[in-house]
């Protein structure tokens, strides 16, 4: 049934809970991680208060992955970034209110990521007057996309990257924060009600605020300039680690050139206080200017040298081996690879300009995974010899080679339990020794999954209707089209029409094994449904049963019959 169609919709990242029967990884204690362990001090949980020329600013760090900032105004305050969960927002605001308990007049999202937006609903619950929600005009589009068609895969990969399944003692940090807390409470995203394209000047609670579009880590990124406070909030365009020019959880191309331009634009304001959304503030004009220069120069170097070598005809894997940061900036603490890496960035820049094909003819239409595995086995002298090579690789701590060999044996489905155990050993070895938290957590979580099964992304809180009001019906129908199972296709040109009480209308036509979505009701409806948007949303995520909804009249079938409608819903899985 469609009950589990959108089972991951209400949560971007799943709970960091594990069953008592889960197999432990026995992650070893290794040397070489001293800098990463020391980096955890960057996120010591606290609220720091600053007296700026324009008034007090309070900075909460260490509560989940992202910082939250409160600026005091006249009879009211503003929040910049609302934390990664309602749970953390509640904890943060308890401390903020001890500093100043005036009502929150506005919440500003610096961009769409959940660690900056998912705590917002807490502020609607604690006061009668709804705070104004301010963001770039594209922010809601990107939130809807992540909570829509990309949700299942982003959920899985984010869980791996942030290590939310790992025992607390094995999670050192996540590079830009101590941990991700989004799973501890329902998602609290609230749609913006004031948006802008390039810049916006406001005065809220006596605070002069200038907002500027600053594409970088996201296309909708903004920075906040408070001229009277001499303070700038750069969002995620700078933090104390090498930038995530590409994130391994998966992302559309990040405009690296735009990121450089945004950092240059920030420099023009010559701020005295820089309050990033991750890691600690930077205080002092020179200190801020130096940090911004190092950051933008590093990004430009990686960008320009990738382009230079691309134009010489080198393939991505060749370019990766040639680009290292210049000695003059390589040892800056702002460029330690605790989040992004130079290698991943090079590949992303190449892909952003030229796409997935690196130029090597052998990679254009390569052998299938199974074909290559068979030929590797033949080359080794058979499956037993290939397995012997894998055993030797693990024995000799040649773990990257072990992972690649295990790929072939898994494709061959050969002695899968032993191969799995060897692969787990290789993943733990590589992950536990990595000083990059993204890689470390991804590898260790992948090992956990091999031992305990793939993440069950249906483990979510289905009880909250609040988020459904923030998710558009358009988003849900987009998801429907991507969940249509062509193996269940039977009726060509079969159309189901939906008329919602909001006066919105939707058609789904099944033809040529695709589900075609349109907004205008046709005269060719095989089934016609009258209902409320919220009721249909609840059905899609499993909060309501379509059989019960038909029986109690919250779904009315005015053309066709319930059997056909239920059969139709069952095609989307």
Feature locations, PLM:
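Sec-dependent signal peptide recognition
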Residues: 2-8
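C-terminal motif of bacterial Sec signal peptides marking the signal peptidase cleavage site
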Residues: 13-16
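Active-site metal-binding motif and surrounding structural segment of the metallo-beta-lactamase
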Residues: 43, 49, 53, 75-76, ...
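Accessory terminal helices/loops
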Residues: 21-39, 151-158, 164-177, 181-182, ...
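Feature captures hydrophobic
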Residues: 392, 398-404, 408-411, 420, ...
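Metallo-beta-lactamase
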Residues: 77-78, 84-86, 142-213, 258-270, ...
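Conserved beta-strand hairpin/beta-sheet module of binuclear metal-dependent hydrolase folds
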Residues: 44-100, 223-236
């Amino acid at each position: 049934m469609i009950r589990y169609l959108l089972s991951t919709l209400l949560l971007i990242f799943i709970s960091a809970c594990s069953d008592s029967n889960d197999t432990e990884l026995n992650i070893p204690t290794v040397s070489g991680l001293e800098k990463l362990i020391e980096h955890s001090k960057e996120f010591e949980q606290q609220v720091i208060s600053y007296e700026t020329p324009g008034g007090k600013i309070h900075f909460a760090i260490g509560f989940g992955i992202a910082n939250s900032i409160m600026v005091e105004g006249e009879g009211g305050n503003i929040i910049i970034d609302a934390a990664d969960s309602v749970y953390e927002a509640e904890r943060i605001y308890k401390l903020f209110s001890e500093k100043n308990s005036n009502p929150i007049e506005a919440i500003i999202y610096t961009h769409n990521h959940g660690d900056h937006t998912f705590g917002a609903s807490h502020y609607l619950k604690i006061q009668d007057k709804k705070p104004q929600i301010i963001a770039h005009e594209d922010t809601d589009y990107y939130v809807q996309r992540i909570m829509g068609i990309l949700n299942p895969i982003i959920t899985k990969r984010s869980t791996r990257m942030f290590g939310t399944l790992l025992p607390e003692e094995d999670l050192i940090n996540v590079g830009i924060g101590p941990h991700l807390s989004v799973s501890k409470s329902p998602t609290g995203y609230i749609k913006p009600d004031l948006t802008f394209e390039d810049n916006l000047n406001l005065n809220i609670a006596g605070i002069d605020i200038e907002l500027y579009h600053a594409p970088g880590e996201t296309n909708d990124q903004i920075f906040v300039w408070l001229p009277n406070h001499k303070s700038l909030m750069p969002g995620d365009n700078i933090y104390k680690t090498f930038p995530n020019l590409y994130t391994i959880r998966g992302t559309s191309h990040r405009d690296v050139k735009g990121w450089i331009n945004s950092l240059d634009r920030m420099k023009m304001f010559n701020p005295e206080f820089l309050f990033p959304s991750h890691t600690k503030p930077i205080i002092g004009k020179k200190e801020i200017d130096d940090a911004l220069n190092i950051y933008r120069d590093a990004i430009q170097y990686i960008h320009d040298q990738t382009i230079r070598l691309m134009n010489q005809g080198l393939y991505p894997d060749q370019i990766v081996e040639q680009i290292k940061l210049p000695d003059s900036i390589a040892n800056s603490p702002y460029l330690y690879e605790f989040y992004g890496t130079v290698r991943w960035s090079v590949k992303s820049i190449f892909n952003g300009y030229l796409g997935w094909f690196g130029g090597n003819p052998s990679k254009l239409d390569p052998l299938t995974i199974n074909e290559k595995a068979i030929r590797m086995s033949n080359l080794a002298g058979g499956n037993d010899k290939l397995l012997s090579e894998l055993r030797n690789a693990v024995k000799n701590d040649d773990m990257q080679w072990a992972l690649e060999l295990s790929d072939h044996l898994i494709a061959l489905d050969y002695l899968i339990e032993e191969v799995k155990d060897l692969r787990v050993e290789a993943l733990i070895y590589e992950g536990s020794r990595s000083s990059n938290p993204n890689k470390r957590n991804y590898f260790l979580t992948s090992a956990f999954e091999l031992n305990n099964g793939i993440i069950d992304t249906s483990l979510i809180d289905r009880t909250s209707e609040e988020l459904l009001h923030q998710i558009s019906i358009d988003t849900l129908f987009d998801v429907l089209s991507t969940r249509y199972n062509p193996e269940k296709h039977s009726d060509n040109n079969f159309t189901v029409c939906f008329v919602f009480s909001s006066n919105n209308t939707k058609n789904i036509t099944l033809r040529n094994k695709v589900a075609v979505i349109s907004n205008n009701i046709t005269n060719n409806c095989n089934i016609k449904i009258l209902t409320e948007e919220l009721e249909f949303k609840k059905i899609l995520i499993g909060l309501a049963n379509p059989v019960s909804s038909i029986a109690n009249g919250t779904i009315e079938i005015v053309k066709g019959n319930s059997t056909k409608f239920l059969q139709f819903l069952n095609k989307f899985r």
